[in-house]
Amino acid sequence: MRFTPAIVIAAFCSLAVAAPAAKAIARSPSEAVEDYVIPIDKKRGEAVEDYVIPIDKKRGEAVEDYVIPFDKRGEAVEDYVIPIDKKRGEAVEDYVIPFDKRGEAVEDYVIPIDKKRGEAVEDYVIPFDKRGEAVEDYVIPIDK
């Protein structure tokens, strides 16, 4: 199949125009595509999401810290919702997930462990690439 000079020139021009546009998107090595979705304030190096959760400049605390009020002893009110066993210093939720004699939570049996390699079976569900990257890394593309 032969191409006319006009087709070759048009193809070359479209590549020359597309290449700089692609480079304009690329920022720096190892930046995930999600970094483009959450824009960064270049002056302060903060993500725009930092403005959504405003920061108290005097104390350096997020406004969300006021929503979960703190006790005089430095404990969040949420600590009262999950009561603490004073004798053992454990949250009551520790009783909901019962523990085995070997100090393993029952949830460890739900996600069985490969004894030889010490890996959870879930590691087989997300297969790994030869370079040690999870296949999910390809779903969220990384800007090399």
Curated annotation (Swiss-Prot):
Maturation and modification: PhomA' is processed by several endopeptidases including kexin proteases as well as the cluster-specific S41 family peptidase phomP1' and the peptidase phomG' to produce 5 identical copies of the hexapeptide Tyr-Val-Ile-Pro-Ile-Asp and 3 identical copies of Tyr-Val-Ile-Pro-Phe-Asp, that are further modified into phomapsins A and P, respectively. The timing and order of proteolysis of the phomA' precursor and PTMs are still unknown. Two tyrosinase-like enzyme phomQ1' and PhomQ2, catalyze the chlorination and hydroxylation of Tyr, respectively.
Keywords for the protein's UniProt record, in alphabetical order: Repeat, Signal, Virulence
Keyword Transmembrane: no
Propeptide part(s) removed at maturation, as residue ranges: 19-35, 42-50, 57-65, 72-79, 86-94, 101-108, 115-123, 130-137, 144
Signal peptide: 1-18
Pathway participation: Mycotoxin biosynthesis
Keyword flag Signal: yes
Function: Ribosomally synthesized cyclic peptide phomopsin precursor; part of the gene cluster that mediates the biosynthesis of the phomopsins, a group of hexapeptide mycotoxins which infects lupins and causes lupinosis disease in livestock. The phomA' translated product contains a 5-fold repeated peptide embedding the hexapeptide Tyr-Val-Ile-Pro-Ile-Asp and a 3-fold repeated peptide embedding the hexapeptide Tyr-Val-Ile-Pro-Phe-Asp, that is converted into phomapsin A and phomapsin P, respectively.
Record-given protein name: Ribosomally synthesized cyclic peptide phomopsin precursor phomA'
Species name: Diaporthe leptostromiformis (Lupinosis disease fungus)
Gene designation: phomA'
